[in-house]
């Protein structure tokens, strides 16, 4: 009985009987499949969020404006099974920056100034995050600006001297309104003090212009000598005045130049419009008409010495040649006399257009000042082959008669030997 109990205990608590090769192979395949399934389940398991809150303070990455950063509500990600052991992995993501809730944005008190001076003496002028931690209600940026603009021991708070204003003017001509760069060139003057001095001088100058005194020059001089403004340097004030005057002059020049340009363009447009209208009215329709008009107006027989029997030839760019042969006196009636071949200029106030030059005499009537010439050929045997220039009979300047169509046709058929250009 005892031996059976011992064997049962050995079977229950002892090693299992040895396995055959087939059983070992099958058991190995099952174990590998089970391990692979467990790993997949552990990876696909959803993230388990816990209610545990972890606060982490990182002193190396401090926010200068909002103080040290606090990280809260970090959740634990689910467990991953690795080789039968469970390990916890915490989230390494950083939460959003949370500013201080109790930051004071008002003026600094004397107690805060004393504390800030002590902390700067202890930690130096660069560790503003550490100083802001020990100074409640103030951020690192506030401490830095308060120190550099107000509490620094080498700051000058007295009135500006002529030398300082001269340096300010020279720097402003080169740099402009870059007050931080100018503060580096003027020792003892901060950025705020330079900007405030500039704006105060500008306001003072504008107020003097608006409120002029109505007293005499002597009384004004006495008051100015007693006033503190008499001791104030005027270098910066004169410089600002020159800048404003230059700006005004530039604006006036721009206005005048723009006005002149407008006037000149308007005059130019008017001139062009007049030229265009005159060219439309005076532009002839044919070059031959202009050529004939110039000959009949500008050249008379007396000027070209036709009475002496010289032969004159006129030519033009259009190819017309006119020959004036030696005239023979007393060929016709004595009414012509020495006026044979004389050409009369066109009247100034003719109502015909430029295209009616050839028919101007017919349209305006025959007068002593008519410009049209009648070309006739004599069928007489004595003067065969000779072309003579004849004028119409002279009438009084006040008389004008109308010519009907028959007279026009009969006058044109008489000069059959003379050809006219086709228009």
From Swiss-Prot:
One of its GO terms (molecular function) is DNA-binding transcription factor activity. Disulfide bonds: none annotated. It holds the Pfam family Myb_DNA-bind_6. Residues 193-230 are annotated as: Disordered. Disruption phenotype: No visible phenotype under normal growth conditions, but in the double mutant plants myb64 and myb119 the female gametophytes fail to cellularize, resulting in enlarged coenocytes with supernumerary nuclei. Transmembrane segments: none annotated. The keyword 4Fe-4S does not apply. Keywords: DNA-binding, Nucleus, Repeat, Transcription, Transcription regulation. Residues 128-151, 179-202 bind DNA. Residues 200-214 have a biased composition (Basic residues). Transcription factor required for female gametophyte fertility. Acts redundantly with MYB119 to initiate the FG5 transition during female gametophyte development. The FG5 transition represents the switch between free nuclear divisions and cellularization-differentiation in female gametophyte, and occurs during developmental stage FG5. The gain-of-function mutant upd10-D (T-DNA tagging) is infertile. This is Transcription factor MYB64. The lineage of its organism: Eukaryota, Viridiplantae, Streptophyta, Embryophyta, Tracheophyta.
């Amino acid at each position: 009985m005892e031996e059976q109990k011992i064997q049962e205990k050995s079977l229950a608590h002892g090693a299992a009987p040895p396995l055959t090769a087939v059983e070992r192979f099958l058991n190995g395949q099952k174990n590998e499949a089970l391990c692979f399934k467990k790993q997949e389940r552990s990876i696909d398991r959803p993230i388990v969020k816990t209610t545990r809150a972890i606060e982490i303070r990182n002193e190396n990455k401090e926010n200068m404006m909002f103080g040290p950063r606090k990280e809260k509500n970090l959740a634990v990600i689910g467990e991953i099974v690795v080789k039968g052991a469970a390990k916890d992995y915490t989230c390494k993501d950083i939460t959003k920056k949370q500013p201080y809730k109790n930051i004071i944005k008002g003026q600094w008190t004397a107690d805060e100034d004393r504390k800030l001076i002590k902390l700067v003496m202890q930690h130096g002028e660069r560790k503003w995050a550490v100083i802001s931690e020990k100074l409640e209600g103030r951020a690192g940026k506030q401490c830095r600006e308060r120190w550099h603009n107000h509490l620094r021991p080498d700051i000058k708070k007295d009135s500006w001297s002529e030398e300082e204003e001269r340096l300010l003017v020279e720097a402003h001509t080169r740099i402009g309104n870059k007050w931080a760069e100018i503060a580096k060139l003027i020792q003892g003057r901060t950025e705020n003090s330079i900007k405030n001095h500039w704006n105060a001088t500008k306001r003072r100058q504008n107020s003097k212009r608006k409120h002029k005194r109505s007293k005499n020059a002597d009384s004004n001089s006495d008051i100015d000598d007693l006033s503190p403004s008499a001791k104030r340097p005027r270098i910066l004030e004169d410089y600002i005045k020159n800048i404003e005057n230059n700006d005004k002059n530039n604006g006036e020049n721009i206005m005048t130049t723009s006005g002149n340009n407008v006037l000149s363009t308007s005059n130019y447009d008017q001139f062009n419009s007049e030229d265009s209208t005159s060219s439309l009215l005076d532009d002839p329709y044919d070059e031959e008409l202009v050529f004939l008009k110039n000959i009949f107006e500008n050249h008379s027989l007396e000027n070209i010495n036709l009475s002496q029997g010289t032969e004159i030839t006129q030519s033009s760019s259009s190819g017309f040649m006119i020959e004036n042969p030696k005239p023979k006196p007393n060929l016709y009636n004595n009414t012509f006399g020495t006026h044979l071949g004389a050409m009369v200029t066109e009247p100034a106030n003719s109502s015909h257009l430029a295209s009616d030059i050839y028919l101007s005499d017919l349209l305006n009537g025959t007068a002593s000042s008519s410009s049209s010439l009648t070309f006739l050929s004599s069928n007489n045997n004595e003067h065969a082959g000779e072309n003579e220039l004849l004028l119409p009979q002279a009438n009084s300047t006040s008389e004008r008669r109308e010519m009907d169509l028959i007279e026009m046709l009969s006058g044109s058929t008489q000069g059959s030997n003379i050809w006219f250009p086709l228009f």
